[in-house]
A protein has these predicted regions:
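Conserved G1/Walker A P-loop phosphate-binding module
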Residues: 1-33
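Canonical P-loop GTPase G-domain recognition
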Residues: 112-158
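Conserved substrate/cofactor phosphate-moiety recognition/catalytic segment
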Residues: 25-45, 50
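Short acidic, S/G/P-rich loop/turn micro-motifs used as interaction or catalytic elements
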Residues: 12-13, 56-59, 79-84, 110-113, ...
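Switch II (G3) loop of P-loop NTPases
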Residues: 46-63
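Inter-motif core of Ras-like GTPase G domains
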Residues: 60-81
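Conserved catalytic network of the ASCE P-loop NTPase/AAA+ motor domain
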Residues: 42-46, 65-70, 95-99
Length: 158
């Protein structure tokens, strides 16, 4: 099993990413040695165990084992914007506390990696466009873009 933590600043699109993962979802298996936590979204797809933790929770000391149990950390950001203080704080925290865990960045709401994100070019970066708007607060990401991320994860971490 490969644990994939999905995190990012509030409003970056974590839930949109999780909601956009193809169905059917299988049951999430809670990793060993982590505290009880109510996860907004958690599911398994084949051997990939996805779970979502928002940035304020991820940087809380009590949840550090949830960060450390991940085999890969997917950090979602608003790709229309520059890396903001919330993203930078989260990224720096993850780098400091989980330096040996592979990280990928997903720039949400865009199809192009802007120059402002070049600081992070040592990491795999994906762009995810909006696929379908359900209502003013809910959307689904582009199926093709989600598939590209899943293909990458399956070929590198399964």
């Amino acid at each position: 099993m490969t644990y994939v933590m999905v995190t990012g600043p509030m409003g970056a699109g974590k839930s949109t990413f999780m909601r956009s993962l193809p169905k059917p979802w299988n049951d999430f298996i809670i990793p060993k040695n982590v505290p009880d936590m109510l996860l907004d979204y958690a599911c398994s797809l084949k051997n990939l165990m996805f779970y979502e933790i928002d940035a304020p929770t991820a940087t809380g000391k009590v949840w550090i084992n949830w960060l450390k149990v991940a085999d890969i950390q997917v950090v979602i950001a608003n790709g229309k914007e520059n890396p903001d203080a919330n993203f930078i704080e989260l990224w720096d925290y993850l780098e400091k506390n989980t330096p040996n865990i592979k990280k990928i960045i997903i720039l949400n709401r865009t199809k192009k990696i802007s120059e402002q994100w070049s600081t992070y070019n040592d990491n795999e970066i994906f762009c995810i466009g909006i696929g379908k708007t359900i209502n003013e607060e809910t959307a689904l990401a582009s199926k093709n873009d989600i598939r590209a991320v899943l293909d990458y994860l399956n070929s590198n971490y399964e």
